[in-house]
Amino acid sequence: MKIWVDADACPGVIKEILFRVADRAKVEVTLVANHSMRIPPSRYINMVTVPSGFDVADDEIVKRLDAGDLVITADIPLASEVIDKGGVALNPRGELYTEQNIKSILNMRDFMDTMRASGVQTGGPAAIGASEKQAFGNQLDRFVTKHHKPV
C-alpha cells in the first residue's frame, strides 16, 4: 500500500501529518505536483514533478496507482477515478470518498459548478481548522493501521 498526494492544492498542515506518518509507519508517501516542493529527507517520502497542464498530476497519480493505494485529494473527479481503479480517496478534511458516496458528491459538485456558471456566488470552503486536521489524522491512522503491513 502506498499513499499518493495530489500535492498542488494539499494544505501544508496536511502534508506535515503525512510526512510524520510516512516515517512512523514506514509507508511510502509520494507527492505529485506540477512544481517542485520541499520535502523532508526520508526514504519513505518521494516527489514526482509533472509538466504544467490541466489534470496532468491527476493523470499521473491514476497511472501509477495500484488497487488498495490511498490518494489524498480534494479533487472529486480524481477521487472518482481512484475509486474506479480500486484505490481509496481521502480529502484533506478527513472525509473518505467511497463507492457508496462518490456519485452523490460528484452530483453536488456538478450542481455547484452550474450555479457558479449562472452567476451565483457560492463561496469556497473554509480554511482547514483544528477539527478537520484532527479528522484527517484520525482517518489516516485508521486506514494505515488497517491496510499497511511494513516490510
UniProtKB/Swiss-Prot annotation:
Family, per entry: Belongs to the UPF0178 family.
Family matches, as CDD domains: PIN_YqxD-like
InterPro entries membership: UPF0178
A Pfam family the protein falls into: DUF188
Signal peptide: none
Protein name: UPF0178 protein Swoo_1444
Organism: Shewanella woodyi (strain ATCC 51908 / MS32)
